[in-house]
């Protein structure tokens, strides 16, 4: 299948005999955005959200009102985990049509995502966001976008959907479920610097890593070795390189977790995470192991 701006333009215009009237350049932000002329910019390599998208140039200001590439880069990174969740095959296409709308020489108008593209992505991805405590934002409400009989970025046809045989995403090492006996649990506890029962207050993403801010009042300390109370007062843990893998074990921001990890370069890095399920046999074993821990 041909790729690039030309093929994308053909896809967008396939059901149109003419371009029709412009629907306005900007959907969001201050009214004066609509008077600012957009211009084409190369999509930078460090715009990870849109890495591998099938066009090279984007418009600024974009459809979210970002006027500089710095603004785009700062805001786009927070959406990478949603793409990594693979809740819908067109999540990246939808988000990039807003953060980095395609810029075509043949067209002065900024092309918006179609209403149906938004609806399909929202239906599949809003529950994933909700599990982490984040509602679908107002700025992405689908009523803002044109119907499919207008000029817009469409939902992929079934020919373009990810095949069922697509390789499963890699699971983060710290999040892999393991069948451990008491000796295994003791060994894991002893080789780590800390073991905590936590609840999550906030999750943010910095570069390739997940920053986990803890609810301080719900924290239970089981083990500290080389980690001070002062370190824990920061109430910040890190899951390294987590944007390159998935962590289904930690997909509910309201659940308690047992986390173990090590102090690395002044940061508390998680090496093991388990959702705490009261009464489950595994956690009864872990509690027993912690009480008689002798490393």
Swiss-Prot record:
GO MF entry, a single one: enzyme activator activity
Pfam short name (any one): Fz
PROSITE patterns hit by this protein: FZ, NTR
Disulfide bonds: 40-103, 50-96, 87-125, 114-152, 118-142, 172-245, 175-247, 190-295
Keyword rRNA-binding: no
Entry-linked CDD domains: CRD_SFRP2 (cd07446), NTR_Sfrp1_like (cd03580)
Family: Belongs to the secreted frizzled-related protein (sFRP) family.
Function: Soluble frizzled-related proteins (sFRPS) function as modulators of Wnt signaling through direct interaction with Wnts. They have a role in regulating cell growth and differentiation in specific cell types. SFRP2 may be important for eye retinal development and for myogenesis.
Protein name: Secreted frizzled-related protein 2
Species of origin: Mus musculus (Mouse)
């Amino acid at each position: 299948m041909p790729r690039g701006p030309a093929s994308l333009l053909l896809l967008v215009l396939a059901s149109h005999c003419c371009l029709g009237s412009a629907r306005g350049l900007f959907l969001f932000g201050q009214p004066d955005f609509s008077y600012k002329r957009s211009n084409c910019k190369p999509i930078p390599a460090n715009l990870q959200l849109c890495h591998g998208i099938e066009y090279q140039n984007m418009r600024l200001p974009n459809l979210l009102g970002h006027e500089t590439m710095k603004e785009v880069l700062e805001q786009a990174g927070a959406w990478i985990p949603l793409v990594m969740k693979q809740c819908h095959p067109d999540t990246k296409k939808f988000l990039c049509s807003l953060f980095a709308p395609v810029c075509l020489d043949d067209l002065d108008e900024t092309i918006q995502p179609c209403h149906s593209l938004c609806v399909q992505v929202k239906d599949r991805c809003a529950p994933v966001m909700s599990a982490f405590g984040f509602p679908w934002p107002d700025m992405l409400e689908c009523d803002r976008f044109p119907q499919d009989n207008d000029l817009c970025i469409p939902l992929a046809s079934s020919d373009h959907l990810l095949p069922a045989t697509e390789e499963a995403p890699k699971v983060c090492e710290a999040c892999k479920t393991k069948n451990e006996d008491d000796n295994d649990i003791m060994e894991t506890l002893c080789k780590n610097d800390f073991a905590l029962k936590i609840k999550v207050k906030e999750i943010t993403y910095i570069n390739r890593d997940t920053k986990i801010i803890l609810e301080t009042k719900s924290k239970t300390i089981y083990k500290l070795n080389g980690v001070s109370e002062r370190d824990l007062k920061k109430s910040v843990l890190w899951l390294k390189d987590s944007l390159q893998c998935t962590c289904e074990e930690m997909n509910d921001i309201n659940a308690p977790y047992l986390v173990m990890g090590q102090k690395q370069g002044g940061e508390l890095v998680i090496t093991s995470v388990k959702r705490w399920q009261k009464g489950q046999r595994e956690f009864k074993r872990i509690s027993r192991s912690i009480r008689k821990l002798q490393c």
